[in-house]
Amino acid sequence: MRHYEIVFMVHPDQSEQVPGMIERYTGAITAAAGTIHRLEDWGRRQLAYPINKLHKAHYVLMNVEAPQEAIDELETNFRFNDAVIRSMVMRTKHAVTEASPMVKAKDERRERREDFANETADDSEAGDSEE
């Protein structure tokens, strides 16, 4: 089986349907004896340029190992689902399991924010004990 990276963008008004869509698409891949190596829901993000007069979309990234028939079925589902405004399926040489750069940056920002909050809490406690 081959490895694929799949990104699809969902209409922002249909964001509440994304978990069901992810479940349906991952179910189709696993039913065809495929495996999902990475699944990231990037959420609603700004588009680089308007698509169908939309400026935002809900992004989902999947890295899978699946037979060609499962990928063909997935592309057909993307094509006939009106909520999916764009999709891209790329074949990759190896399975990608590490977090994407977007998720890594998000985690780093969260860690920095938590560290800063802990430092300010420690500083305020130290200031209270001096009085």
Swiss-Prot record:
One Gene Ontology MF term: small ribosomal subunit rRNA binding
Composition bias, Basic and acidic residues: 104-116
Region ranges (Disordered): 98-131
Source domain of life: Bacteria
Chain intervals with Acidic residues compositional bias: 120-131
GO annotations of cellular component type: cytosolic small ribosomal subunit
Keywords of the record: Ribonucleoprotein, Ribosomal protein, RNA-binding, rRNA-binding
Pfam families from the UniProt entry: Ribosomal_S6
InterPro entries, per the entry: Ribosomal_bS6, Ribosomal_bS6_CS, Ribosomal_bS6_sf, Ribosomal_S6_plastid/chlpt, Transl_elong_EF1B/ribsomal_bS6
GO BP annotation list: translation
Family matches, as HAMAP family: Ribosomal_bS6
Functional description taken from the UniProt entry: Binds together with bS18 to 16S ribosomal RNA.
Family that this chain belongs to: Belongs to the bacterial ribosomal protein bS6 family.
Protein's name in the database: Small ribosomal subunit protein bS6
Organism: Klebsiella pneumoniae subsp. pneumoniae (strain ATCC 700721 / MGH 78578)
